[in-house]
Amino acid sequence: MTDKELQENWNELLNIYKGILFNNCDFYNGINDKLTYDFACLQYAILKEKYKLKDIAKQGSELEKAIRLLSFFAPQITHKGDFQNNIGCNAIALLDYCLDKPEKGINCLNKSKILQECCLALGIYARRIWLMPYSPFDTENHVVIEIYDFSLKKWVMLDMTSNGYFVNADGVPLSVLEIRHNLAINITCEFIKTASTHEKFFINMQMERLYYKQYFAKNLFYFYVEAHNEFGNNNKRYCFIPKNFDLEKNIKQKSLSNIDIPPIGDISILLNTPE
């Protein structure tokens, strides 16, 4: 496939995925609960000291600090989609395993955990979000984080895998729900990379932006979010699904057991200011 054909293919897929989102804008009214965030984990002191997080993040807003962490760590971690999750899912164990070790890659699930815990260690509200596709035959998904910025008074999505985030027409960084909304109604939603160069797979930055735009559009149909955000894994999650979407049927088609079906949360949970 030529670069032009690839570009046309990604544009076509983008339009298909945006159409799916357009026809599924309204979310199910589920449990109205609050997510919690733990800033007191003893391991955060170790993480801050070992990796000099304050020196990396410097001063500024929560978003400015988080972007500096993203920009520092993302290029030093190799991506490995088929990583077996055989390392403890916490930033200390993961960074020890993969940082600046090209032969030891990890997946988005674990990359996002690193950035989340580095943010939490600096007192920044941060949570992982699983981005899930519409098709029950698509077993690939993505995991990112959101941080809360008090100057912007909003949540912002950051992605360790792509080393970037999305902005609207005014250049305002967007949350996961805002990215979904903008794609669904076909208004400006542009990918911004913190690095100035594109990955070798892409011929230029424009192609890289297009790829991630269609990739996110594919995976923004429904979401999982951890109920408690802390050091290490938390097994309790909420799911946020569009109306008329049969989550149980979808999961069964993917050959996952019923135990994997979390409670349905109200979408307002993702909009709330953290406390």
Label each PLM-derived region with a short phrase:
Residues 3-6:
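RecA-like P-loop NTPase motor core of helicase/translocase proteins
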Residues 61, 107-111, 137:
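Short, contiguous, pocket-lining structural segments
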Residues 8-106:
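Secondary-structure boundary elements
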